[in-house]
């Protein structure tokens, strides 16, 4: 365990020696390139994901989708796995399959038409962004000032909407 002052992380810290403050929530989207969907066909229901190639981040081995009337859980079984979201995005742009990505990584790619949303009527489980820091009694005033600053940082809040 290395010493640190503060960290940004997705998901609530599980370590009881850490204090966590949620900054906000970032939506994720299911996306593919227009070329991929022309070649492989569009989807009308998440059940059809088994007929498609998935590009999956190791931390998101389960895709939880929700429509107005139904919840659906998809477990990609023969997915192209990665631990790099930028790589997953670039694979999707290149037509390698369907992926889930956070809003901050895809906004410009969707605007330019490099990626399109798959099953837009279905919501994908998003991510919470947390500020984590040790629960030491004597955290420095500089650290506490930084934490207060980070909690107000508008560029982060542009993608992570408070709950």
Where are these predicted regions, by residue range?
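C-terminal effector-binding regulatory domain of bacterial HTH transcription factors
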Residues: 103-108, 112, 122-163
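Paired acidic/hydrophobic, glycine-rich loop segments that form the ligand-binding mouth/hinge
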Residues: 5-9, 97-101, 117-118
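Alpha-helical segments flanking ligand/cofactor-binding loops in enzyme cores
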Residues: 21, 47, 89-90, 144
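Alpha-helix/helix-capping structural signal
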Residues: 34-35, 86, 104-105
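Short beta-strand->loop
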Residues: 20-23, 77, 112-124
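Acidic, Gly/Pro-rich loop/turn segments at junctions of secondary structure
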Residues: 1-82
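A ligand-binding cleft/hinge motif common to bilobed small-molecule-binding domains
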Residues: 89-114
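Conserved, function-defining micro-sites of small-solute handling proteins
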Residues: 76-82, 86-87, 92-94
């Amino acid at each position: 365990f290395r010493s640190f002052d503060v960290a940004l992380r997705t998901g609530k810290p599980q370590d009881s020696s850490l204090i966590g403050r949620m900054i906000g929530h970032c939506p994720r989207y299911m996306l593919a390139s227009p070329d991929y969907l022309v070649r492989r066909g569009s989807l009308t229901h998440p059940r059809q994901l088994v007929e498609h190639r998935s590009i999956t981040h190791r931390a998101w081995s389960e895709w939880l989708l929700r429509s107005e009337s139904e919840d659906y859980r998809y477990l990609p079984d023969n997915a192209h796995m990665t631990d790099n979201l930028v790589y997953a995005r670039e694979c999707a742009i290149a037509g390698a399959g369907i992926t889930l990505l956070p809003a901050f990584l895809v906004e410009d790619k969707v605007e330019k038409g490099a990626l399109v949303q798959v099953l837009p009527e279905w919501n994908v489980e998003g991510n919470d962004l947390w500020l984590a820091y040790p629960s030491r009694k004597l955290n420095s005033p500089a650290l506490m000032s930084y934490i207060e600053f980070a909690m107000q940082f508008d560029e982060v809040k542009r993608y992570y909407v408070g709950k």
